Amino acid sequence: MKKLLLLLAAGAVLASAGMLYLPVYPAAVWVFDESKGEVVDRIPLVTGTPMSIRLSPDHKRIYVGTIDHNGIEVIDVATHKVINHFILNTPTKQFRFWNGTPDPQGKLFYTVSKEIEKFSDHYEVGKPKYTVIDLEQQKIIKTAELGKEEQSDNDIDFGRAALEVSPDGKLLYQFGEHITILQADDFKIVEKLELAKPNFPGMEHVHFGGDLDLINEPGQHFAIFNSEDPIVHNKVFGLARFDLSTRQMDFTEVGPAPAGIAGLEVTPDKKLAYTVVENGKHGNKRCEFWAFDLTTDRITQKEEVPCRTRFTLGISTDGKKLYIYGAGFEIEVYDAKTLKYEKTWNLNVDVTYAGIVVTP
């Protein structure tokens, strides 16, 4: 399960094509016009290769994390200009982080980081820590140790468990094998929502996971989850809904879990969703589009699609097209209604696996 998606606002059915912000090698974000099918701007980055990208709650800024020196760059959506950039590394320390989220005011950036200190004869690698970065001071202003139970969401590929700040800026949510709700000012745990007991009997080990993709309705989430029974370890997958304000979760089992699921993309009217599933390995690997009716939580359509070793699934701003991209030079376009291939946009540049940002 690769993607955890915020629900789209009820009235936000978009009639026109939008802009795709694509993180590319070696150090840039390209702006791609959906209607023209071409790159319309190139935003150079100062601090290195982009490895994470996140849209602000008000859709006015884009936050990019870079890997070369562990930097952050802030892009103004209106002008396509970098308005703030800095690195966290010092000559003797690295502060590695994967992704994160800004606060509603755009002053702070929350992430999970790992400190690596260089000595004359060795390196010391610290444990992952909750981290607050002041975007104006351009430095880390606070860290906090993770509890033992939070280590499982951060030890492997630390910091990939998705983070989100509540609309009032007071709470921080981390999504992984459970949902951890913390006070944003001191990282004290307010509540932990265990995902081991969905509302169908005999199942455990539910896992949300993945990246949050900010859309229009803060605090509302659709997700694909995996679960297995504790006796014979029969794995199933399903759809989950989670409301940050009420902390209510709703699980619906769909069927046997495939070997891999590449995210969940939701249409603007919240009636349909799409994913790509993988089964088999190597020469026997088979991939399919699956379409879901979110009013019934059932699969309505399947269509085979060529497999890639690595890829990301995306959706157009009007919900009519599906994109397969990442770790390559192309964006493949599919019709969401028929799930059939339409065309390929050749970018002539390597897109990173940081994801994309889509704006109207």
Feature annotation, model-predicted:
Residues S16-D41:
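An edge-strand/N-cap motif at the start of beta-rich repeat modules
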